[in-house]
A protein has these predicted regions:
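Short, flexible loop segments at the rims of nucleotide/cofactor-binding pockets, characterized by
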Residues: 3-5, 63-67
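Mid-to-C-terminal alpha-helical segments outside catalytic/metal-binding sites
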Residues: 24, 34, 64, 71-87, ...
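Histidine/acidic residue-rich metal-binding segments in metalloenzymes
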Residues: 1-57, 72-84
Length: 122
């Protein structure tokens, strides 16, 4: 699945879909596969293709779920796309939920509300 997620993100961004449809909300599972790890290569590809915006800018138009192991992988995705583009994700609630949920406070509320365009009264 990580390959498919990586290809999907690259296709959406390099294909200009996010630029043509700026209000389109796409949430990619598992932190986008290997996209954070390969971002620099895709950035070079975007430059070679002559895209109007950078790969990094368009990457931040997507949403990513946090269904990753805690640690370096999660940290890399957050540093690549920003905490404000992360939402909580899990396959089976409970057994794979992070032990420390405080890192996901913003993802569990504010970001999910934005992504789902829900009304919110604080």
């Amino acid at each position: 699945y990580a390959y498919e997620e990586t290809i999907a993100v690259a296709s959406l961004v390099l294909g200009g879909v996010m630029q043509r449809h700026p209000r389109l909300d796409v949430c990619v599972s598992h932190g986008g596969g290997a996209i954070a790890f390969l971002k620099q290569r895709f950035e070079s590809m975007a430059t070679f293709l002559g895209t109007e915006s950078t790969f990094a800018e368009d990457l931040k138009l997507l949403w990513f779920d946090s269904h990753l192991e805690e640690g370096p992988a999660h940290d890399l995705v957050v540093s690549t796309v920003g905490q404000d583009r992360m939402v909580f994700g899990t396959n089976f609630g409970g057994w794979d939920t992070p032990t420390v949920i405080t890192d996901f406070d913003q993802s569990l509320t504010t970001n999910a509300i934005k992504l789902l365009r829900l009304p919110w009264n604080e």
